[in-house]
């Protein structure tokens, strides 16, 4: 059986991107092939996360809609045949690309009226998922599944850049 292809819509902030590595480690343990879309500020970090197969620049500034760009970007993703998208940010705009790309399963937490855009909507229970890493990992598992112990985020070092 081939690996399941998953698209992750990454967080915009560097700290959240580092924490998202726990999700990528969990997905990789379950034989998922992981592609990630990220803004320019955090995309370089993805080259240091070994579980990520491919990172793609999503060139939309924080708060910008740029619907035409999102639609074109989504169309370019269709040929990748993703089976699932995991949307880490809680904004309506962050869920647009997976919807427009016709990805069959679109997972994320409820927020900002995303009912049409997501079809695997999770309710956030802050007592069950108190930490951001818990929330990210929960989106990579079936709803209400018990969480495994998270791996510590670890980034690879580029030996060429060391002096």
Cite the ranges covered by each PLM segment.
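Catalytic machinery of carbohydrate-active enzymes
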Residues: 1-163
């Amino acid at each position: 059986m081939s690996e399941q292809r998953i698209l992750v819509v990454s967080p915009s902030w560097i700290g959240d991107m580092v924490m998202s590595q726990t999700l990528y480690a969990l997905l990789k343990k379950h034989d998922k092939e992981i592609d990630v879309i990220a803004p320019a500020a955090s995309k370089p970090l993805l080259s240091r996360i070994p579980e990520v197969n491919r990172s793609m620049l999503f060139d939309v500034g924080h708060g910008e809609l740029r619907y035409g760009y999102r639609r074109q970007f989504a169309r370019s993703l269709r040929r990748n045949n993703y089976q699932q998208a995991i949307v880490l940010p809680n904004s309506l705009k962050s869920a647009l690309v997976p919807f427009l790309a016709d990805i069959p399963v679109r997972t994320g937490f409820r927020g900002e009226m995303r009912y049409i855009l997501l079809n695997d909507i999770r309710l956030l229970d802050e007592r069950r998922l108190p930490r951001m890493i818990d929330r990210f990992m929960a989106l990579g598992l079936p709803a209400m599944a018990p969480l495994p112990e998270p791996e510590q985020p670890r980034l690879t070092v580029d030996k060429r850049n060391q002096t």
